[in-house]
Amino acid sequence: MIISLFVVSSFAIADNQVKILMLGDSLTQGYGLEEKSGLVPVLQRWLSSNETDVLLINGGVSGDTTLGGLERLDWLLTPDIDGVVVALGGNDLLRGFNPVFTKNNLEKIFTQLESKGISAAVVGTISPLNYGPEFKKEFDDIFPALAKEYGLFYVDSFFVPLVDKQTQQISINLLQNDGIHPNDKGVEAIVAYIGPVIKDFIKSLSQL
């Protein structure tokens, strides 16, 4: 614990260190996991081991929707934030919100970031077929379209690396008992998948 606190403190005092806000829901927060095993700490360690000097700020809130993220954004954007990774939309999907609602909220988030000169990356969410093919297409298209419109770094979904290639279903061995949230191994798989994109995003900030 002492070592962990020292490392965090060392990161915090580096004036020239890039600081990234991870704006998301329970997946970002690290729901159901020990703090060290959550997405943000594991990604922090992955980036550090891959020669990327960055401090990740955990802005994940369990159950948060795109509207909740939008409402929290302003006070989370402290002057030292250099970039934001937006990973919202999963709870909109679970609640069956109209894709237009989700898109509008995300547009407001990225417009606000753009107006402040803050670069962003977006992690998409892929809809199942439960709501029908038209809903799925409209929802799935939101994220790549926004990435193109706002020039965002883009990851298609946290869950892509959790899919078993043989069954084409998410592997239950990578999920917690609730069948929704990733376990420790699931988080490791997610970080290995998204890490290179986030690394490139951070590298782009140093070139601005």
List the model feature ranges, each with a label:
Residues 28, 65-66, 102:
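Ser/Thr-centric signal marking residues that sit
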